[in-house]
């Protein structure tokens, strides 16, 4: 399998004027990642996706109905904000992953399509609006995720807890998975809050191997993220823990297997592995497209070392068919 860089490049990019960070203003592309330690030089070359990566794009009435409902209640879905390739499929099945605490992130991760900037104040009505939307859509399993909110004293944990509690009040039989940020510098207070309102699945993505953290997750720490997963499991031993990795940004398969072993050593139960697809030429470049056989090999290895559930395939994403993942069904 070739390791040729097929989109963009990493280097010390020439300096250009950068927009100021102002409250409520979204920064994307170069304006978002320009201050990152590893620079990205944009390219107009568009890599050809292999045959095994096929995404059906559609805009059915059910998709538009969900979008309109989210707009009406001032809610966001990570499906749209992060340009997920599975948006049409999930929306068409009447499911969505909700993104709380706004649509502006305090981090500058170059793989992510969510905007960076100085976020607005939290919407105190969001937990109720979220619960109402879930009830109106008659959902049985939801994923609640968020932007990073390093500006908040609890990292947003209290808002997560309110959303969990309010959603269960409106939908008593609802299953809730949370995909949380790393609560950098605020782990103790965040865990104290979340153990009082635990979800049904606790998910925090490592995203990549530690060697690539500087370029892919500036501001994050590999050991910290592992510790967050371990400590939540200690606080709520009956709640499954979950993490995910994106492949194709320069990692080696043996490095991925080491991360998998690290996750198991920190009592993580579930794992997702998917192909990274760059949202634009200004994002982290795709180094290679990982073959489905390699995803299958990693899934088999995951079960060998004790994961209870592994979803591994080119279009797998952390919240893709999360209900089926939680039920132990095979996802690829």
From Swiss-Prot:
Sites where the protein binds [4Fe-4S] cluster 1: 79, 84, 90, 319
Pathway(s) served: Protein modification; protein lipoylation via endogenous pathway; protein N(6)-(lipoyl)lysine from octanoyl-[acyl-carrier-protein]: step 2/2
Keyword Endoplasmic reticulum: no
GO MF term list: 4 iron, 4 sulfur cluster binding; lipoate synthase activity; metal ion binding
EC number: 2.8.1.8
Catalytic activity: [[Fe-S] cluster scaffold protein carrying a second [4Fe-4S](2+) cluster] + N(6)-octanoyl-L-lysyl-[protein] + 2 oxidized [2Fe-2S]-[ferredoxin] + 2 S-adenosyl-L-methionine + 4 H(+) = [[Fe-S] cluster scaffold protein] + N(6)-[(R)-dihydrolipoyl]-L-lysyl-[protein] + 4 Fe(3+) + 2 hydrogen sulfide + 2 5'-deoxyadenosine + 2 L-methionine + 2 reduced [2Fe-2S]-[ferredoxin]
Keyword Transferase: yes
Cofactor binding note from Swiss-Prot or TrEMBL: Binds 2 [4Fe-4S] clusters per subunit. One cluster is coordinated with 3 cysteines and an exchangeable S-adenosyl-L-methionine.
Binding site for [4Fe-4S] cluster 2: 105, 109, 112
Cofactor: [4Fe-4S] cluster
Family, per entry: Belongs to the radical SAM superfamily. Lipoyl synthase family.
Entry protein name: Lipoyl synthase
